[in-house]
Amino acid sequence: NCASWLGPNKWYDAGDERFHPENIICDSRNTSHLFIIDHKTGNIVWQVAPPFVGADAALAPITGVHGTHMIPRGLPGEGNILLFDNGGTMPGDLYADSQAHAWSRIIEFNPVDKTRVWEYSAATMKVSPGQHGYKFFFSPYISIAQRLPNGNTLIDEGACSRIFEVTPMGEIVWEYRSPYGYAPAMKANTTYRAYAVPYEWVPQLKK
């Protein structure tokens, strides 16, 4: 569901060839698989995948993932991986019923040792991940997250067209809900992705 260049990063500068700036990081919503493709050879040189054993276990269970990317150089958390873990249920023998969860989360982690650096979810916000958690933060499909220059994170909870900004402590400091539906007679709406862009990209707007 998502693919992007890694771009310049500290891991490659330190000699780790897996993170060559021209390599491509991808994710698969249907298999909950994160991987990096060597642009020259086509080989998979890094991955996080079911059944989430070894170092991957610290990140499990990841289900229905979207928007996996490396935080660009110059931003807080640069070099870490940021993704939207949608949650829900996933088909296949690699997933047990106990791994299903009706809540979403944003995960930031170090790609070298796969340790979790930051998370935003109903659980981290001290909200029960039951029915209350479902209402609090859950998008079982689409969605994305973006690290901002101020250290906050912009989150697109796409299934309900909710876009909001949270601090590293999880405080919501800005929120927008799109009023636009699929059609005049339908109240449901979705936002596939949402990004913050620099003011200079839209010079006609006032700061």
Where are these regions (language model features)?
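Histidine-/acidic-rich catalytic cores in large beta-rich domains
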Residues: N1-K207
